[in-house]
Amino acid sequence: MGNRLVGQRIVVVGGSSGMGLAVSAQLLRRHCEVLIVGRSRDKLDAAREALRAFGAPRLHQVDVTSEAQVQRLFEESGPVDHLVCTAADIRGAYELLPQLSLDALDRAIRSKVVAPILLAKHGAQRMPAHGSITLTSGIAAYRPRPKGVAVAAINAALEGVVRAMAVELAPLRVNAVSPGWVRTPIWKDVAGADSEPLLASMAEQLPVGRVGTGDDIADAIVFLLGNGYTTGTVLHVDGGHRLV
């Protein structure tokens, strides 16, 4: 299936770290033309170095919560076959309701719901009929925990967006991958120095006995990019988390 993507032009929003970086690496190995989009110039430059062995992605520094910047991104990017978005800013969003700040909630909603809508609004019209948009939701929509109200709501909302866009933007395909607990830098933001013990505890609770990796999620995203008969779908890659 990977051969179907050779030469395809793919924008990866959030492709400079975590799951997005793993996606970028897999796509470069499949000889795709990859444009990595992110807010941080330092992270973009670091991603280029990390990916050097696989190819040379293009880089574009953009705040995807800004409609003007998203519009300019697609005006300057040239043709695009597929769009992937793994970006999320959930700093401060994992809190009990009395401590949840409106700023953190607004930031998380804008990064994970508003941004994908803006990307589709300005990107879909420039994409061919065989193209696709793949977003990332998350296990919190299905197995919420204390402090998870904001993230559960946001992931559930995003999956509604996916289904609606799959209808409205057809024949363009729109899907989501719903990761479970995955070892990415985001856990440093959530748990700080406690991130490793937390991940170890999570692994013990899962049927597969481990937390996920960026490549686990990248495999699923690449599948959705290449499968032309899948749309409006949420693909769960969660180590069996929904079963326990």
Please name every model-derived segment.
Residues 30-46:
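Conserved glycine-rich Rossmann-like NAD(P)H-binding loop of the short-chain dehydrogenase/reductase
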Residues 159, 168-184, 230-237:
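Conserved Rossmann-fold SDR core element
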Residues 210-237, 242:
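C-terminal substrate-recognition "lid" of short-chain dehydrogenase/reductases
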Residues 51-68:
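Rossmann-fold cofactor-recognition segment
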Residues 94-97, 101-106, 198, 202:
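Substrate-binding pocket helix/loop in short-chain dehydrogenase/reductase
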Residues 89, 99-109, 113, 117-119, ...:
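Catalytic loop of short-chain dehydrogenase/reductase
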Residues 195-216:
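Catalytic Tyr-x(3-8)-Lys segment
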Residues 16-18:
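Conserved glycine-rich cofactor-binding loop
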